[in-house]
A protein has these predicted regions:
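Active-site beta-loop-alpha junctions enriched in small/polar residues
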Residues: 20-24, 92, 112, 143-147, ...
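Flexible, glycine-rich active-site loops centered on histidine and acidic residues
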Residues: 1-63, 107, 115
Length: 260
């Protein structure tokens, strides 16, 4: 809350704060975070709605009141909030859609994660939406994995490292440093993991600037969302500087020109 309050003070009206209950990692690490040594309490996920309300209150000028033995204390993310960042609830299930609707918050569906259940979750959110003072109408956007290159063949090659990482995550393998395009090509995916990789890639936007722009517009229209968030996932090749991501920069540059 403090970090986003600072960003909002520096760039008022330009900051979005997304809150989700998933830790964004493999099942073993997720268990360790929630239950293992030093992790949060077992009921932390169940208390997620309370956490959302607390963060929203801390960002507001009024703050959140905490009752202690010494009296009621007010916590604020910043001493003098003149504006607050837009709060978006993140999710990939009916649970998150219902919670966002109940709290009258904008909703982000993690379409990049599985690509399944998108229409159902968004319809549920809109049907059950309860207007709030800050957000009288439902607001939605999708997240999409995108790789764009001058040719389809190059885009497909650049997608390989992230696909391999996602296959490892889905099949319970330990997470490691992402491979280079050349390394994935040399390793070659087995038949089983190759099928899984192709299924995931089919839900991504991988192609030329023109085809990618058309596909993103089609997704936005199909699901009736207000915005689409592009997640550039193009990998690196041998010789790429470790502090740069030229293939991801290329994705954004080419896509921006095609959408202009």
């Amino acid at each position: 809350a403090e970090q986003f309050a600072l960003l909002e003070a520096a760039y008022p009206g330009r900051i979005d704060l997304g809150i989700g209950r998933a830790p964004g990692t493999d099942p073993v690490t997720a268990w360790a975070l929630r239950h293992g040594g030093g992790g949060v309490e077992e009921d932390a996920a169940a208390r997620f709605p309370e956490a959302v309300a607390t963060i929203a209150a801390m960002l507001s000028p009024a703050g959140v009141g905490l009752r202690l033995a010494s009296g009621t204390h007010v916590l604020r993310a910043t001493p003098n909030a003149t504006s607050v960042p837009d709060l978006w609830l993140l999710g990939s299930s009916d649970y998150s859609a219902r919670l966002a609707a109940r709290k009258g918050l904008p909703y982000v569906f993690a379409h990049h994660f599985s690509g399944r259940g998108t229409a159902q979750a968004l319809a549920l959110y809109r049907d059950e939406y309860q207007p709030s003072p800050a957000y009288p109408e439902p607001q939605t956007f999708l997240t999409v994995n995108v790789v764009v290159a001058p040719t389809l063949e190059e885009a497909q090659r650049l997608a390989l490292p992230n696909l391999a990482s996602m296959v490892a995550l889905r099949t319970g393998q330990p997470l490691q440093a992402q491979q280079l395009v050349d390394e994935v090509e040399e390793d070659d995916l087995t038949h089983a993991t190759g099928v899984l990789a192709r299924q995931m890639r089919d839900r991504w936007v991988v192609g030329t600037p023109e085809s990618a722009a058309a596909e993103l517009r089609s997704l936005a229209t199909m699901f009736g969302v207000d915005e689409v968030m592009v997640h550039p996932v193009a990998g690196a090749v041998r010789g790429t500087p470790i502090d740069r991501a030229p293939a991801r920069e290329q994705t954004l540059r080419l896509l921006s020109a095609a959408l202009a």
